């Protein structure tokens, strides 16, 4: 037993030793990778990067940047790369002692140092590329500025007439660019690449602005010297022609406004000559806005005249229509009020319409007199005609509505008479059906309903004979009588149908009297109720008796009665 225990312990020890050696082998591979990485980063071309800067002009800012980067290289090597060798050596020693965690910490530290070293290299590479790119950008901007300088100078010289009095100032501004180009060369020669970049970039923007001025100035001069004066002249003579045609354009104030605009225009060219183009554009925009306002007023007058010519005849027709309709209404009201009740407010409205129409006609006459003058402000005439048109339209609508009301009075009377005749005819027809039916007697309530209808009809007939007739009240009463008649007819139909149905049920049930005493008893009760005009109750008892001996038969009998 002891032997087995000893063997087990030995096996466990061997396994543990094997695991330790396996782990050390894995850790050894990590250390080897760190060594390989160290060898790789030692070859990073720090010096080659700096060599690119040495090809530039190592003065001023460039020299300062070069020295700083060179110093950073030394510091990076001493701070990040030099300690790596020691860290790796420590890791190997600890690994030999099977101190895995401590060895791993040393390797991690070594990797962090190498990361920092690589970052330092990457930062140096970016800085070098940035400096080289800035040098290249500076040279490109410089070449462009030189070309622009020559072209701008040539353009002013060749097209001096297009720039007017601004040509001299343009030449002066262009000449200022030459010493600034030379200043760039000095900054570049001194190695001050950042100052050189800021200088040439600012110069390029100023050249762009002056170039835009050179493109804009000929357009501004053309507008100032030709286009606007031409528009002033066209507007002046155009208004003169319109006045000859009869237009009143005093409110446009053409002469005074044009004189004011000419004065304002005279300040534009000096602004252009001083290259104050923003102020010049503002003044031109203001002049154009005022011109547009004048054109709008004139165009409004022309359109107003066309509108006046189109609407004048329409308004004339509407006024005559209103006057004729008013006369017709006055005559018709006097005739109609003898036969029909008419609200006094309607008669007053007609008289009021007469006064309003006469007032509108007077206004229209004044407008026509105004239009006969040698100078007419058609916009005012248009507004006045619109006022007339709106009011006469309202009057015509109201008069037509009143006229339709008078016509409707006759139609309503005829309709009421026709409805009353139909009520009388229908009432007699329904009552005859009640008398000719199988009813033992006409129920008293139908006699009462018939008498009430007769009374209402006589009352309405008496009102028809009276004058003047209040048509609305009469029509309402006839409508109530029609409702009474419909109720009378509906209830009579129900009673007639129920009486036939009850009789059919009793007749059908006679076959069961001998065999079923309870059926015989129920049918006797149904006959008694039938004789007393209680048809619905008779139906209920007869249906119950028949369903007890022959289920479903009552539905069949009811369908036959409905078909009849």
From Swiss-Prot:
Membrane topology, Extracellular segments: 1-4
UniProt keyword terms in alphabetical order: Cell cycle, Cell division, Cell membrane, Coiled coil, Membrane, Septation, Transmembrane, Transmembrane helix
Pfam families: EzrA
One GO biological process term: division septum assembly
Membrane topology (UniProt): Single-pass membrane protein
GO cellular component, one term: septin ring
Coiled coil ranges: 101-138, 190-223, 271-300, 350-435, 471-550
Location relative to the cell: Cell membrane
Keyword Cytoplasm: no
Cytoplasmic side of membrane: 24-564
TM region positions: 5-23
Annotated family: Belongs to the EzrA family.
Function comment: Negative regulator of FtsZ ring formation; modulates the frequency and position of FtsZ ring formation. Inhibits FtsZ ring formation at polar sites. Interacts either with FtsZ or with one of its binding partners to promote depolymerization.
HAMAP family: EzrA
Protein name in the entry: Septation ring formation regulator EzrA
């Amino acid at each position: 037993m002891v032997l087995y225990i000893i063997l087990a312990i030995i096996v466990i020890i061997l396994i543990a030793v094997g695991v330790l050696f396996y782990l050390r082998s894995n850790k050894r591979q990590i250390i080897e990778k760190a060594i390989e990485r160290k060898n790789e980063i030692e070859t990073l071309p720090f010096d080659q990067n700096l060599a690119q800067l040495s090809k530039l002009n190592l003065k001023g800012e460039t020299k300062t940047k070069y020295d700083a980067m060179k110093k950073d290289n030394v510091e990076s090597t001493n701070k990040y790369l030099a300690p790596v060798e020691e860290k790796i050596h420590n890791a190997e020693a600890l690994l030999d002692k099977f101190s895995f965690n401590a060895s791993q910490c040393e390797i991690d530290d070594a990797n962090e140092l190498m990361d920092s070293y690589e970052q330092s290299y990457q930062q140096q590479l970016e800085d070098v590329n940035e400096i080289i790119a800035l040098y290249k950008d500076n040279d490109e901007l410089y070449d462009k500025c030189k070309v622009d300088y020559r072209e701008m100078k040539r353009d002013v010289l060749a097209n001096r007439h297009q720039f007017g009095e601004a040509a001299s100032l343009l030449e002066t501004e262009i000449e200022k660019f030459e010493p600034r180009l030379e200043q760039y060369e000095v900054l570049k020669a001194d190695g001050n690449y950042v100052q050189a970049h800021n200088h040439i970039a600012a110069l390029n923007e100023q050249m762009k602005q002056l170039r835009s001025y050179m493109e804009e100035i000929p357009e501004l001069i053309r507008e100032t010297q030709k286009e606007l004066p031409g528009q002033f002249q066209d507007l002046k003579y155009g208004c003169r022609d319109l006045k000859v045609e009869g237009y009143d354009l005093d409110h446009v104030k053409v002469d005074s406004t044009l004189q004011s605009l000419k004065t304002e225009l005279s300040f534009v060219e000096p602004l252009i000559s001083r290259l104050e183009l923003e102020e010049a554009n503002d003044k031109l925009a203001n002049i154009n806005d005022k011109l547009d306002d004048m054109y709008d007023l004139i165009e409004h007058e022309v359109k107003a005249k066309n509108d006046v010519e189109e609407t004048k005849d329409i308004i004339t027709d509407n006024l005559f229509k209103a006057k004729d309709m008013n006369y017709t209404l006055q005559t018709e009201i006097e005739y109609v009020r003898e036969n029909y009740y008419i609200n006094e407010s309607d008669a007053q409205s007609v008289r009021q319409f007469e006064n309003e129409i006469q007032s509108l006609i007077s206004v229209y006459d004044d407008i026509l007199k105004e239009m006969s003058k040698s100078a007419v402000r058609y916009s005012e005439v248009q507004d006045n005609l619109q006022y007339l048109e709106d009011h006469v339209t309202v009057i015509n609508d109201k008069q037509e509505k009143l006229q339709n009301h008078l016509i409707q009075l006759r139609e309503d009377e005829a309709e009421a008479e026709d409805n009353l005749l139909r009520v009388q005819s229908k009432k007699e027809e329904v009552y005859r059906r009640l008398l000719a039916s199988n009813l033992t007697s006409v129920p008293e309530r139908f006699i009462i309903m018939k008498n009430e209808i007769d009374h209402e009809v006589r009352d309405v007939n008496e009102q028809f004979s009276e004058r003047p007739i209040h048509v609305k009240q009469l029509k309402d009463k006839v409508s109530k009588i029609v409702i009474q008649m419909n109720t009378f007819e509906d209830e009579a139909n129900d009673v007639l149908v129920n009486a036939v149905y009850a009789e059919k049920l009793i007749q059908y049930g006679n076959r069961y009297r001998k065999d079923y005493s309870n059926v015989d008893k129920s049918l006797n009760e149904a006959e008694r109720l039938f004789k007393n005009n209680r048809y619905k109750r008779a139906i209920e008892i007869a249906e119950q008796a028949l369903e007890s001996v022959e289920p479903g038969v009552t539905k069949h009998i009811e369908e036959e009665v409905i078909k009849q």
